[in-house]
Amino acid sequence: MASEIVVDHREKALALLKRDADKILKLIQVQMDNLTMPQCPLYEEVLDTQMFGLSREIDFAVRLGLVDEEEGKELLYRLERELSALHDAFTKK
């Protein structure tokens, strides 16, 4: 029974982190769809704040043992790749 609860907490923690990562991904995709200048100070501030917040959430979940460190790193890496693609798309515009 206790192991089922731990697994449930881990699944919930990972699902919440993925949901937060998806919100950031949507911000990036909106910018890509519109090719809005990624150097906009407001855009950068919002995205930086969101990415920092997610990294802290992931760190907390890892420290609690709810999320594997590699899973957390992969979530951030995926967002960083998308952000890099946005910058590449804008510079080729």
From Swiss-Prot:
Top-rank taxon, per record: Bacteria
InterPro entries named among the record's database cross-references: UPF0358, UPF0358_sf
Gene3D superfamilies: SO2669-like (1.10.287.750)
Coiled coil (UniProt feature): none
Family membership: Belongs to the UPF0358 family.
The name this protein goes by in its record: UPF0358 protein BLi01701/BL02974
Provenance organism: Bacillus licheniformis (strain ATCC 14580 / DSM 13 / JCM 2505 / CCUG 7422 / NBRC 12200 / NCIMB 9375 / NCTC 10341 / NRRL NRS-1264 / Gibson 46)
